[in-house]
Amino acid sequence: MKETPLSNCERRFLLRAIEEKKRLDGRQTYDYRNIKISFGTDYGCCIVELGKTRVLGQVSCELVSPKLNRATEGILFFNLELSQMAAPAFEPGRQSDLLVKLNRLLERCLRNSKCIDTESLCVVAGEKVWQIRVDLHLLNHDGNIIDAASIAAIVALCHFRRPDVSVQGDEVTLYTLEERDPVPLSIHHMPICVSFAFFQQGTYLLVDPSEREERVMDGLLVIAMNKHREICTIQSSGGIMLLKDQVLRCSKIAGVKVVEITELIQKALENDQKVRKEGGKFGFVESMANQRITAFKMEKAPIDTSDVEEKAEEIISEAEPPSEVVSKPVLWTPGTAQIGEGIENSWGHLEDSEKEDEDEGGSDEAIILDGMKMDTGVEVSNIGSQDAPIVLSDSEEEEMIILEPDKNPKKIRTQTISATQVKAPSKKPVKKRKKKRAAN
């Protein structure tokens, strides 16, 4: 999958923020991201987190035949893998230019600097030596892979323990971990890589660039150094021309950062060794907290907003005072009102107005059936009452038989009013009825 390029707006935003000495995550120019080191249950297994960049390191060993030109030295082998789990742009099973450059830089930093005593890895000269293999897997990519990989490699080598061996004549005996305690590697110093990103043709400088900052940078300078301020390797990429003063300034900054990282590594190794001796719980399950994958979530970053607050106060002080707030609604014409924030609405009740309209218009259409009696003596005014049921039928007359105790059945004829007969009288008789009422 091809990497998604940055838009022009994002690129201009990043460059403008760098010109103002600001970064997206709130760091200063020379600040490193938080470094966290976790160890597994086996020796030589660790995970290093540099911000959101995560690298897994695993060290293994085996007895092999030495090289012909170096019969008394062991073999060191480094392998870095970039999987699609770290970033979709990485293609599996393909040696990209970035991967080749990172592997070569790791070999120059760790193997060519002689940080590990390879002669101590020899078992029988010219026959058996230890081959130490360091496998590094990038789990998540958020920029500055080389720094995280170098820290993971040196931490895994310091934490690793090889099995103990003994030689009697031509026989080589390999002891298990239960028979003898494993032996740590002989490490002289800890070389650590520190990356510097340059922008605007070397005008601006950032330490530990993130993934987005790497996309807009013009060049990269990597300095590998130990805590004794000895430069192990230095590499510049990007095609920019650096001055001698710039390189010296970067080396001084790298010396300070390397001392801090070395102290962090030694403290993590001591804590792990202490927990293992005391018989406590150790491993990734105990040292790494549960993490949840969330979408549309922004992490809080400590950002200094004092300058923004000062500008806001200046704008408010220079602005004109606000006009007086009207506390009551202004009625411009009858039947109108003003709706605003903090003002109570003064609209009339719609139900009351509707009832008044119904009373005025319904008086003309009222049905007055008082005093009207049918031949049967049943008053029509009782039709709408709840006690007397309304019977709708097409027939004019019906026969009803009433059964009473100790009496003969009686037949009573009642007259029902059909639905077509119950009609509202016209307006003329209603008006006459009103006149009669007025006369009375």
From Swiss-Prot:
Record location of the Glycyl lysine isopeptide (Lys-Gly) (interchain with G-Cter in SUMO1) cross-link: K297
Signal peptide range in chain numbering: none
Chain positions of cross-link Glycyl lysine isopeptide (Lys-Gly) (interchain with G-Cter in SUMO2): K297
Family statement: Belongs to the RNase PH family.
PANTHER family: EXOSOME COMPLEX COMPONENT RRP45, EXOSOME COMPLEX EXONUCLEASE RIBOSOMAL RNA PROCESSING PROTEIN
Residues recorded with modification N6-acetyllysine: K297
Matches recorded under Pfam families: RNase_PH, RNase_PH_C
UniProt GO cellular component terms: cytoplasmic exosome (RNase complex); exosome (RNase complex); nuclear chromosome; nuclear exosome (RNase complex); nucleolus; nucleoplasm
Feature: compositional bias, Acidic residues: 353-362
Keyword Transport: no
Species whose genome carries this gene: Bos taurus
Bias kind Basic residues: ranges: 425-440
GO molecular function, one term: mRNA 3'-UTR AU-rich region binding
Protein's GO biological process: exonucleolytic trimming to generate mature 3'-end of 5.8S rRNA from tricistronic rRNA transcript (SSU-rRNA, 5.8S rRNA, LSU-rRNA); nuclear mRNA surveillance; nuclear polyadenylation-dependent rRNA catabolic process; rRNA catabolic process; TRAMP-dependent tRNA surveillance pathway; U1 snRNA 3'-end processing; U4 snRNA 3'-end processing; U5 snRNA 3'-end processing
Annotated segments matching region Disordered: 341-362, 404-440
Subunit and interaction comment: Component of the RNA exosome core complex (Exo-9), composed of EXOSC1, EXOSC2, EXOSC3, EXOSC4, EXOSC5, EXOSC6, EXOSC7, EXOSC8 and EXOSC9; within the complex interacts with EXOSC3, EXOSC4, EXOSC5 and DIS3. The catalytically inactive RNA exosome core complex (Exo-9) associates with the catalytic subunit EXOSC10/RRP6. Exo-9 may associate with DIS3 to form the nucleolar exosome complex, or DIS3L to form the cytoplasmic exosome complex.
Entry keywords, A to Z: Acetylation, Cytoplasm, Exosome, Isopeptide bond, Nucleus, Phosphoprotein, RNA-binding, rRNA processing, Ubl conjugation
Record's subcellular location: Cytoplasm; Nucleus, Nucleolus; Nucleus; Nucleus, Nucleoplasm
Protein name as it appears in the record: Exosome complex component RRP45
Function statement: Non-catalytic component of the RNA exosome complex which has 3'->5' exoribonuclease activity and participates in a multitude of cellular RNA processing and degradation events. In the nucleus, the RNA exosome complex is involved in proper maturation of stable RNA species such as rRNA, snRNA and snoRNA, in the elimination of RNA processing by-products and non-coding 'pervasive' transcripts, such as antisense RNA species and promoter-upstream transcripts (PROMPTs), and of mRNAs with processing defects, thereby limiting or excluding their export to the cytoplasm.
List of residues that carry Phosphoserine: S65, S306, S346, S393, S395
